[in-house]
Amino acid sequence: MEDQMDVLLERQWDGLRSWLAEVDILRYRDRASGLGTWTLGDLVAHLGYGLRMLTEVTAAPAGAAPMSLGRYVGAYPPAAPTIAEQTSGLAAELGDDLLRGVDAMVADAWRARRQISASVVLGRRGPLTRDDYLLTRLLELVVHGDDFHRALPEIQASPVVPDAAVAVAGALSAAYEERSGRPPTRTTPPLPWIRLAAGRVSSPDPHLPLL
């Protein structure tokens, strides 16, 4: 089963993976990512970690009401220490095979994704629609693709696919409205808004960040 979200997710991964190859990301693997103690090598490993979650997805129990995407991603912060520890462990485990290891994880993720036929699935944080689950994976790629770009200011081109940024910005706008009761003041261009929503840029808004 595949639809437009599947296509967009693959497009963003393909764009990001090509960018990582073009910039020879392993030359920069020890550079700080701007995300706590993570290096860019850790961030590469985290891409595989995030997409590999597709292999864990199952159909939600019959009658399960899907969560909104906003509620789902709002449950991320408590898990952050565990995710950080597991990501660093994965990066160390992959070692010099970092990119090949991530490629293998993504190949497994795509095979699993194509087998997901249920309209409501069960992710780590609860049930949500299949499309919204894929959107959480797209959000990861867009946010972290931008993290790579900001950590490498000498590289002009961004790895973020414009259509993917628009989709993620729209989803985060809906999540903001659900939380605050009003739409965000400004969401275009999409990347500055995504940085605010993801906590990459500080804001006095008490409803931010969203994840």
Regions found by a protein language model. Give the residues of each.
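Conserved alpha-helical segments that form or flank metal/cofactor-binding pockets of metalloenzymes
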Residues: V44-A84
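Structured surface interface patches that mediate subunit assembly and partner/cofactor docking
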Residues: M1-V7, R27-R31, G36, A59-L69, ...
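Alpha-helical bundle segments that constitute or directly flank the non-heme di-iron/ferroxidase center
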Residues: M1-D24, A45-A59, A104
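Amphipathic alpha-helical interaction segments
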Residues: D42-A45, A167
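A short, structured beta-strand-centered segment in the mid-to-C-terminal lobe
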Residues: T82-A104
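Helical hydrophobic small-molecule/effector-binding pocket
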Residues: P77-I83, A109-I116
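Hydrophobic alpha-helical core bundles mediating ligand binding, dimerization, or RNAP-core interactions
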Residues: W13, V102, V106-R113
